[in-house]
């Protein structure tokens, strides 16, 4: 049984990890443990690079907390231009898989608050009246009226991040480069 460390205690993220590992490895083939670790980036990362660094740093910190585990998974949501998205980072042994989620265009009323230094989740809570939005369906759930959720979008991206660990083509050695 695989020991999977989720570099988060957020239920929406842990649910996405659970769904992805169910799909790839099967229910009952792993156990997930959530740990609270720092991302090393601001609470609201801006830009793809900063967001990806946050996901990678979560994995690095989770590996330090639980080095005996088999997998470590970091998810970091961010804002780039007028879009929200997230980076998924999965490590197993010495290999890494990464994927970026789908993006959602945000309305100006939300972006104004973010430009003033507030987090997307806090802005959504104020405008929607739903407390703790980011641990539920997230902005995605609110704007799509539940057709998509933070969990469902992260699930898809996690499936892509897990590909290097189960697709045999990724295990093949690279062909030698021809001599020039």
From Swiss-Prot:
<feature type="binding site">
    <location>
        <position position="68"/>
    </location>
    <ligand>
        <name>Mg(2+)</name>
    </ligand>
</feature>
<dbReference type="GO" id="GO:0009117">
    <property type="term" value="P:nucleotide metabolic process"/>
</dbReference>
<feature type="binding site">
    <location>
        <begin position="68"/>
        <end position="69"/>
    </location>
    <ligand>
        <name>substrate</name>
    </ligand>
</feature>
<dbReference type="InterPro" id="IPR002786">
    <property type="entry name" value="Non_canon_purine_NTPase"/>
</dbReference>
<dbReference type="GO" id="GO:0000166">
    <property type="term" value="F:nucleotide binding"/>
</dbReference>
<keyword id="KW-0479">Metal-binding</keyword>
<dbReference type="GO" id="GO:0103023">
    <property type="term" value="F:ITPase activity"/>
</dbReference>
<comment type="subunit">
    <text>Homodimer.</text>
</comment>
<protein>
    <recommendedName>
        <fullName>Inosine/xanthosine triphosphatase</fullName>
        <ecNumber>3.6.1.73</ecNumber>
    </recommendedName>
</protein>
<dbReference type="Pfam" id="PF01931">
    <property type="entry name" value="NTPase_I-T"/>
</dbReference>
<dbReference type="GO" id="GO:0017111">
    <property type="term" value="F:ribonucleoside triphosphate phosphatase activity"/>
</dbReference>
<keyword id="KW-0378">Hydrolase</keyword>
<dbReference type="InterPro" id="IPR026533">
    <property type="entry name" value="NTPase/PRRC1"/>
</dbReference>
<dbReference type="GO" id="GO:0006772">
    <property type="term" value="P:thiamine metabolic process"/>
</dbReference>
<dbReference type="InterPro" id="IPR050299">
    <property type="entry name" value="YjjX_NTPase"/>
</dbReference>
<comment type="similarity">
    <text>Belongs to the YjjX NTPase family.</text>
</comment>
<dbReference type="InterPro" id="IPR029001">
    <property type="entry name" value="ITPase-like_fam"/>
</dbReference>
<dbReference type="GO" id="GO:0046872">
    <property type="term" value="F:metal ion binding"/>
</dbReference>
<feature type="binding site">
    <location>
        <position position="38"/>
    </location>
    <ligand>
        <name>Mg(2+)</name>
    </ligand>
</feature>
<keyword id="KW-0464">Manganese</keyword>
<keyword id="KW-0546">Nucleotide metabolism</keyword>
<comment type="function">
    <text>Phosphatase that hydrolyzes non-canonical purine nucleotides such as XTP and ITP to their respective diphosphate derivatives. Probably excludes non-canonical purines from DNA/RNA precursor pool, thus preventing their incorporation into DNA/RNA and avoiding chromosomal lesions.</text>
</comment>
<keyword id="KW-0547">Nucleotide-binding</keyword>
<keyword id="KW-0460">Magnesium</keyword>
<feature type="binding site">
    <location>
        <begin position="8"/>
        <end position="13"/>
    </location>
    <ligand>
        <name>substrate</name>
    </ligand>
</feature>
